[in-house]
Swiss-Prot record:
Role of this protein: Succinyl-CoA synthetase functions in the citric acid cycle (TCA), coupling the hydrolysis of succinyl-CoA to the synthesis of either ATP or GTP and thus represents the only step of substrate-level phosphorylation in the TCA. The beta subunit provides nucleotide specificity of the enzyme and binds the substrate succinate, while the binding sites for coenzyme A and phosphate are found in the alpha subunit.
Gene name of this polypeptide: sucC
Listed InterPro entries: ATP-grasp (IPR011761), ATP-grasp_succ-CoA_synth-type (IPR013650), ATP_grasp_subdomain_1 (IPR013815), Succ-CoA_synthase_bsu_CS (IPR017866), SUCC_ACL_C (IPR005811), Succ_CoA_ligase-like_bsu (IPR005809), Succinyl-CoA_synth-like (IPR016102)
Cofactor annotation remark: Binds 1 Mg(2+) ion per subunit.
Alphabetical UniProt keywords: ATP-binding, Ligase, Magnesium, Metal-binding, Nucleotide-binding, Tricarboxylic acid cycle
Organism, scientific name: Rhodococcus erythropolis (strain PR4 / NBRC 100887)
The protein's required cofactors: Mg(2+)
Documented EC number(s): 6.2.1.5
Matching SUPFAM superfamilies: Glutathione synthetase ATP-binding domain-like, Succinyl-CoA synthetase domains
Name the record gives this protein: Succinate--CoA ligase [ADP-forming] subunit beta
Coiled-coil ranges (or none): none
Residues holding ATP: 45, 52-54, 94, 99
Length: 389
């Protein structure tokens, strides 16, 4: 889960990372109030989860309250790379002597953590990495040892920060590591980390990505969810504990087990090449349980996707036998009633498959077609989706 800048700074403050004073608002009047409270020049910053805000006119210096109001009026509602600005961070403007870069992230390739640091901050780090790779230090972090002050200082040294700020930078870097570990983050980035004329170190910007798999032990993170920006279908799936990702195709997919669902996406995409280029509409894994309630929840999500023209239910019976899956499908269709209005192609295999197929045959639902193999089912689902386009 990506956080807005103001949310990242809330976590920074929680762990003692120094930042500029400020508050978030969603109105021009609120921007005026905050600017008046601060009583100094402020920065008015668009709160969107995308880079390049400054170039798009989403970050503006405001020397006085009137300027802050004018800038708030200009930024609210601004479209930045498809993200409409609905919130502003109004923060005290800081005098800047130098700008640095620091981040902690999960290094999946090497199965460890990675710190990155550079004396060249304030610009897109991808540009620095490409044009001057030697300016970006990459330091592996031992997951057991972590980052103490001494190691934090070595990170700052590797990034070639000036000697006179190494100690102050080390303190901030160590606290950023605490944010990374204690908040179960996948990324903590500060760009720029600034040095003020009196040698203070401040995190003027912040980017944090939280690991949603750790939500069970981070109850406070629920408050960071941006429900307005979340796809309503994904929100409905989450409320029903379904693993769902919306795609841009026409064939809805339901399967049990991530591996089977991924394989189903592949065969549907392949079959779609022969049927007008139709593609999978989603990833939906119902897990080990295929009860009527679970199946109804899954179908409810998929059938409410206007792009979906057909549904492919692909289940391998294991602990949950195929007859239970079949009863789940029949029960789900009864529960949904008229909402179930798109053709379903069902492929069952595994434990008690013959009984499962018998149950579906006896139900004789007009929308359900039972197919024996995955390839045939994918082809049929793609054909039906193409015909309905």
């Amino acid at each position: 889960m990506d956080l807005f800048e103001y949310q990242a700074k809330e976590l920074f403050a929680k762990h003692g990372v120094p930042t500029s004073a400020g508050r978030v608002t969603d109105t021009v009047a609120g921007a005026r109030e905050i600017a008046e409270e601060i009583g100094k020049p402020v920065m008015v910053k668009a709160q969107v989860k995308v880079g390049g805000r400054g170039k798009a006119g989403g970050v503006k210096y405001s020397p006085d309250v009137d300027a802050a109001v004018a800038n708030a009026e200009a930024i609210l509602g601004l479209d930045i790379k498809g993200h409409v600005v609905k919130k502003l961070l109004v923060a005290e403007a800081s005098d800047i002597a130098e700008e640095y870069y620091i981040s902690f992230l999960l290094d999946r390739t090497n199965r460890t953590y990675l710190a990155m640091c550079s004396v060249e901050g304030g610009v897109e780090i991808e540009v620095t990495a490409e044009e001057n790779p030697d300016a970006l230090a990459k330091i592996p972090v031992d997951a057991v040892k972590g980052v103490d002050l001494a190691f934090a200082r070595s990170i700052a040294e590797a990034g070639k920060l000036p000697a006179e700020v190494l100690d102050a930078a080390a303190v901030t870097i160590q606290k950023l590591w605490e944010v990374f570990i204690n908040e179960d983050a996948l990324l903590v980035e500060v760009n720029p980390l600034v040095r003020t004329p009196d040698d203070q170190i401040l995190a003027l910007d912040g980017k944090v990505t939280l690991d949603e798999n750790a939500a069970f032990r981070q109850p406070g993170h629920e408050a960071f969810e941006d429900r307005d920006a979340t796809d309503p279908l994904e929100l409905k799936a989450k409320e029903n504990d379904l693993n769902y990702v919306k795609l841009d195709g026409e064939v809805g997919i339901i399967g049990n087990g991530a591996g089977l669902v991924m394989s189903t996406l592949d065969v549907v995409a392949y079959a779609g090449e022969n049927h007008g280029g139709v593609k999978p509409a989603n990833f939906l894994d119902i897990g080990g349980g295929a009860s009527a309630a679970v199946m109804a929840a899954g179908l409810d999500v998929i059938l409410n996707d206007a792009q979906v023209k057909s549904v492919f239910v692909n289940v391998f019976g294991g602990i949950t036998a195929c007859d239970a899956v079949a009863n789940g499908i029949v029960g789900a269709l009864k529960t949904l009633g008229d909402e179930a209005n798109k053709p379903l192609v069902v492929r069952l295999d595994g434990n008690n498959v013959e009984e499962g197929r018998r149950i579906l045959a006896e139900a004789n639902h007009p929308l359900v077609t039972v197919v024996a193999t995955m390839d045939e089912a994918a082809d049929k689902a793609a054909e039906l989706a193409h015909a309905a386009k």
